[in-house]
């Protein structure tokens, strides 16, 4: 299955394992809760989906790469204790608590949540000395004398032997005690994730043209040459910062992440072309409603160039959709905090300044706590930090304009909220107008051809673009989407009629 299907299967497994019956016991007994074993090529996102699953399920995640551990750190250190057997005092060997088990209890203490996932990566690459310990763990869910706490689902991962020489194959007895899931790379599925992860537009456009270069592992006389999903994502992150700093993005830089010289050279050449198209077609002008004269030449351009133009439009619009998503989340958090402020002011729990100071301290602590416990992703953290900054702005405003009475202080703060909302609504209007102009440009240049179909499909697949359209609406999107759906249905009816007539 692909990584998206694997993620859903893990969510289903977690929910099933953590379901309780009418007596409060787990519906599936702990001894029947098989550890999940994900097996697939390196760098396709096995670790990343575990973070997503934990956040979506609202549970803990404790992650370890097991190859980084020795037998002692996995099962604990030995110590001598005194026992009495049949009236005779004897010395016996016991073990301290495993570092891994201890970290689970630490995480429970930090988050206050007693259920979670224990994720162990590279499980089938352990050393010979640690192998018996891992087999015992998979079979009995124990490290040494200590058991994984009930409520923690065990998920493990590993690579097939063709990708890693250190792989140790499990025997049938072990495989019969795990829930094994094979994962394969799939660009179309990764692309959905890529939109949400804000992968660089040049990478998405390039891979749309050269899908076979998304994931590649080749062995030759010089060793292994490879490109992985992880490589593309890491490259994207650094590219954005390099662009901000004005650093060169060329073959010598790209090959550090895409460790296949041919693919690295090809992408570096495409990136140069991508920037050339950006200058030629003047995307900001198109989104403002003007159609540059040279834009009409693309009608007869190679299809690769058309895809690059669509990518540039989608990337530029995507930045506005991401901004909408972030500011909406921040404004909602800000609004919630103002509700608490209003309530406390009504109850006379202090002046506006005093209450805000307490709120800011409490909210800041909550952000730190949730971040440390791994309960929020990066976008949620950014939204909460933006709301925190808004609260600090309110505190500064009260210091200057505060009246000291409840009504006056709240009106002062509400004024700041209203100003932020007014700016946000203008940005929403601008983004909607830019999207409409993009549709008008494509309709004028390409009509309702395959370019329009691709543009609509990518908008519908994008997490932030779909959020924007579904929450804010856009007449042009609905118009062209409806037309294309009607054309598809008409073609389907024609095909069915031809089939019935035997033609």
Predicted feature descriptions by range:
Residues 299-503:
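Terminal-proximal interaction/regulatory segments of ATP-powered molecular machines
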Residues 5-8, 15, 33, 52-55, ...:
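Residue-identity detector for glutamine
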Residues 93, 268-269, 361, 367:
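Intrinsically disordered, low-complexity segments enriched in small/polar residues
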Residues 1-212, 220:
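AAA+ P-loop NTPase catalytic core and its hallmark functional loops
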């Amino acid at each position: 299955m692909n990584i998206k299907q694997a993620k859903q299967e893990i969510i289903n497994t977690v929910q099933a394992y953590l379901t309780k019956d009418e007596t409060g016991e787990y519906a599936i007994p702990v001894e029947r809760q098989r550890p999940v074993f994900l097996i697939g090529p390196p760098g396709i996102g096995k670790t990343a989906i575990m973070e997503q699953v934990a956040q979506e399920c609202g549970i803990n995640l404790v992650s370890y790469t097991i190859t980084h551990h020795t037998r002692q750190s996995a099962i604990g250190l030995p110590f001598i204790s005194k026992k009495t057997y049949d009236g005779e005092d004897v010395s016996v060997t016991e073990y301290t608590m495993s570092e891994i088990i201890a970290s689970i209890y630490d995480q429970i203490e930090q988050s206050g949540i007693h259920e979670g996932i224990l994720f162990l990566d590279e499980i089938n690459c352990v050393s010979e000395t640690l192998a018996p310990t891992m087999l015992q763990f998979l079979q009995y869910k124990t490290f040494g004398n200590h058991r994984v706490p009930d409520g923690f689902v065990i998920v493990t991962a590993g690579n097939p032997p063709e990708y890693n020489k250190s792989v140790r194959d499990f025997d049938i007895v072990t495989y019969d005690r795990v829930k094994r899931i094979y994962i394969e790379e799939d660009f179309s599925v990764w692309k959905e994730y890529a939109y949400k992860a804000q992968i660089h537009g040049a990478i998405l456009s390039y891979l749309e043209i050269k899908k076979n270069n998304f994931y590649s592992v080749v062995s030759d006389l010089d060793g292994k040459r490879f490109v992985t999903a992880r490589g593309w994502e890491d490259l994207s992150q650094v590219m954005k910062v390099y662009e901000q700093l004005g650093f060169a993005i060329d073959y010598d830089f790209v090959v550090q992440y895409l460790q296949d010289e041919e693919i690295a050279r090809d992408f570096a050449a495409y990136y140069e072309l991508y920037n050339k198209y950006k200058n030629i077609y003047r995307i900001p002008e198109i989104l403002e409603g003007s159609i540059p004269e040279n834009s009409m030449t693309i009608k007869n351009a190679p299809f690769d160039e058309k895809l690059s133009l669509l990518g540039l439009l989608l990337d530029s619009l995507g930045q506005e959709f991401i901004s909408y998503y972030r500011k909406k989340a921040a404004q909602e958090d800000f609004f919630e905090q103002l509700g608490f402020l209003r309530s406390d002011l009504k109850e006379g729990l202090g002046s506006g300044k005093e209450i805000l100071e307490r709120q800011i301290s409490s909210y800041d602590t909550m952000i730190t706590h949730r971040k440390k416990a791994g309960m929020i992703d990066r976008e949620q953290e950014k939204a909460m930090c933006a709301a925190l900054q808004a609260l600090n702005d309110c505190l500064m405003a009260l210091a200057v304009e505060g009246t000291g009475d409840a009504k006056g202080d709240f009106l002062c703060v509400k004024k700041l909220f209203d100003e932020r909302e007014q700016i946000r609504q203008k940005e929403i209007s601008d983004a909607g107008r830019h999207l409409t102009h993009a549709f008008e440009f494509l309709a004028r240049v390409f009509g309702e051809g395959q370019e329009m179909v691709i543009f609509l499909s990518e908008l519908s697949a994008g997490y932030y673009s779909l959020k924007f359209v579904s929450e804010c609406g856009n007449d042009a999107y609905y118009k062209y989407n409806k037309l294309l759906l009607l054309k598809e249905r008409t073609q389907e009816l024609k095909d069915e009629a031809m089939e019935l007539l035997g033609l």
